[in-house]
Structures are given as structure tokens and as C-alpha cells.
A protein has these predicted regions:
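Short S/T/G/P-rich N-terminal loop/turn motif that feeds into the first structured element of a domain
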Residues: 1-69, 75-94
């Protein structure tokens, strides 16, 4: 399942990128999550991303994983602001 989501961040986009590229790498692999695209607004307080999870039944487990929660919070993600904007069937990245 591919989806577009958004959430608030408080420590900037580079800090969030480090979270995804380094700190969450093992957890993303464990739960089959891939981030295909991400961008931030001008003041780097909100991220918009397109991600994919291999097994939709693992979404809740990933979001409830205590280490994932801890790492995301430490990286400045406002967990309560997360919103799935839409699922995605087709896409192209140039």
C-alpha cells in the first residue's frame, strides 16, 4: 500500500532525514516500510511524504513500536499531527 502523509516537525528537515536514513533504517526494513519521496515546507515545520508498506496489517504495529515512537519523538516529530492524506495507486517520480 502506497500513501501520502504529512506531519509536523520541530527540529528541521535535515534532522528528520537523519531519522529516516540512519536511526529508523532497521525498523523500516523490519516492517517493510519504504519512503519514496519527502519534502518540507519553507520553514521546515511540516513534512509531506509518499511511503509504502508491504503488509498493510503492519501499519499499526510500526506506529505502536516503542522504539519507533521514541526515535520519532526525539527527532522532533509531533506524533499527534500525523495525517494520511490519501492512498496512492499510481505515481511517477522524474
Amino acid at each position: 500500500m502506497k500513501f501520502v502523509s504529512t506531519f509536523e516537525i520541530t527540529k528541521g528537515f535535515d534532522r528528520w532525514l537523519h531519522l529516516v536514513d540512519v536511526e529508523l533504517k532497521e525498523k523500516l526494513e523490519k516492517y517493510g516500510v519504504k519512503v519514496h519521496f519527502a519534502c518540507a515546507n519553507d520553514d521546515e515545520t511540516r513534512v509531506y511524504d509518499m511511503s509504502e508498506i508491504d503488509d498493510q496489517s503492519l501499519v499499526e504495529a510500526f506506529m505502536a513500536d516503542e522504539e519507533v515512537i521514541k526515535l520519532r519523538t526525539e527527532a522532533g516529530v509531533n506524533l499527534s499531527s500525523a495525517e494520511v492524506l490519501s492512498t496512492v495507486d499510481k505515481f511517477k517520480i522524474w
